[in-house]
Amino acid sequence: MLLEKSLEEAPVVNRNGYWYFIHPITDGVPELPPELLREVAYRIVRALDSTDFDKIVCVEAMGIHLGALLSDMLDRPLVIVRKREYGLDGEVEITQEKGYGVEKLYLNGVSEGDRVVVVDDVISTGGTLVGLINALDDVGAEIEDVVVVVARGGLDRVREETGVDVKYLVRVEVSEDGVSVVESRYR
């Protein structure tokens, strides 16, 4: 599959002792081939328990291309969790704990009773998803599924802190030697 091959060929860089992989799906660099984006979108759809939900929720920035394509494919509205505050009624501030620090995100456009699917590019520590899932719970949304493309870590944390099992297309390990795909799903 293209996703696995492209991950195994992805360059890695060291930032303060942490090995990051650079990939079109997770970084937008280098260019994102349409056939890779299509493959990922179809695999995400296969991962869903049902397509009977109200909205797709994704996180700025690297969840947007995934969410937009899925929104078009499944004819569902797209909600983008943003990194900037708009001050709209009902806006929810989310604390996003990442491997390299803490940031704020802002959720708009989700109401009590909305059935949502959360889509993101990668999970490393689980901090972003824990914050987002808690915010969705706070507004009374029903989380139908949470799917990420690449799982690097954080799956147990999300399950323990929210009770939600995150689905993923591939699980990877990253070191100075590169990216190793250790599990592949929804092919």
UniProtKB/Swiss-Prot annotation:
Enzyme Commission number, as recorded: 2.4.2.8
Subunit: Homodimer.
The keyword Nucleus is annotated on this UniProt entry: no
Family the UniProt entry places it in: Belongs to the purine/pyrimidine phosphoribosyltransferase family. Archaeal HPRT subfamily.
Pathway, per record: Purine metabolism; IMP biosynthesis via salvage pathway; IMP from hypoxanthine: step 1/1
Function, in words: Catalyzes a salvage reaction resulting in the formation of IMP that is energically less costly than de novo synthesis.
Compartments in which it is found: Cytoplasm
Gene symbol of the encoding locus: hpt
Protein name, per record: Hypoxanthine/guanine phosphoribosyltransferase
Top class in the EC scheme: transferase
GO biological process: IMP salvage; purine ribonucleoside salvage
Keyword set includes Glycosyltransferase: yes
GO molecular function: guanine phosphoribosyltransferase activity; hypoxanthine phosphoribosyltransferase activity
The reaction(s) this protein catalyses: IMP + diphosphate = hypoxanthine + 5-phospho-alpha-D-ribose 1-diphosphate; GMP + diphosphate = guanine + 5-phospho-alpha-D-ribose 1-diphosphate
Keyword set, alphabetical order: Cytoplasm, Glycosyltransferase, Purine salvage, Transferase
GO-annotated cellular components: cytoplasm
InterPro entries in the record: HGPRTase-like, PRibTrfase_dom, PRTase-like, Pur/Pyrimidine_PRTase
Record-linked PANTHER family: HYPOXANTHINE/GUANINE PHOSPHORIBOSYLTRANSFERASE, XANTHINE PHOSPHORIBOSYLTRANSFERASE
